[in-house]
Each structure stands twice: as C-alpha cells, then as structure tokens.
Amino acid sequence: MKFIAVVAALTASLAMAAPTESSTDTTYIACPISLYGNAQCCATDILGLANLDCESPTDVPRDAGHFQRTCADVGKRARCCAIPVLGQALLCIQPAGAN
C-alpha cells in the first residue's frame, strides 16, 4: 500500500516538473487587436490622422523589421491603422517594435 502511494507521489511530481512550452516561442503581432488592429503599408502620413496610398502587406510580418522591410520594398512605411478604406487609412500609428 505504501509502495503505491510513493509511486503515485513520484509520478505526480515528475508531471508537475515537466516544462509545457518554450518561453522563447513567441509570435509577433504587429498590430494587436484594438482600435489600431489593421496592418498597412502606407506612402504618406498626415499627422497620424490620415494615411494615403495604403495597402495590406504582401507577407505576414514575422517581426517589426520584417514588417518595415516588406513595406519599404514597395516604397511605403509600416503602419497600424484603425479604418482602412479604398487605399486610405484613418488614425494610424507605428507598429509594435518599429523605430
């Protein structure tokens, strides 16, 4: 009877000590879901209120640098916008981690 209790306790302690996920395995979210949740590549920024000639990035951003390079490849800047409509976007900010 004591043997079963010892085995059960040992098994439980091993299960609790096993790591679940790597903490370095994070996913980059350029524009967290909020008011500014739409990733856009825009050519002209007018005081952060309006952006002109905007389009969605051609690749899903892997990190801030990748997002900026993807937009720079088409001559635009990475932005997180609130309301993208017909190539224009209202209320835009820089993406997370961008310079």
Curated annotation (Swiss-Prot):
It is found in: Secreted, Cell wall; Secreted. Keywords: Cell wall, Disulfide bond, Secreted, Signal. Disulfide bonds join 31-80, 41-71, 42-54, 81-92. Its main location: secreted. HFB1 is partly responsible for the reported antifungal activity of S.alkalinus, and may serve as a potential source of lead compounds, meaning that it can be developed as an antifungal drug candidate. GO terms for cellular component: extracellular region. The keyword Transit peptide does not apply. It comes from the Eukaryota. Residues 1-26 form the signal peptide. Aerial growth, conidiation, and dispersal of filamentous fungi in the environment rely upon a capability of their secreting small amphipathic proteins called hydrophobins (HPBs) with low sequence identity. Class I can self-assemble into an outermost layer of rodlet bundles on aerial cell surfaces, conferring cellular hydrophobicity that supports fungal growth, development and dispersal; whereas Class II form highly ordered films at water-air interfaces through intermolecular interactions but contribute nothing to the rodlet structure. Homotetramer. Further self-assembles to form highly ordered films at water-air interfaces through intermolecular interactions. Belongs to the cerato-ulmin hydrophobin family. This is Class II hydrophobin 1. It comes from Sodiomyces alkalinus (strain CBS 110278 / VKM F-3762 / F11) (Alkaliphilic filamentous fungus).
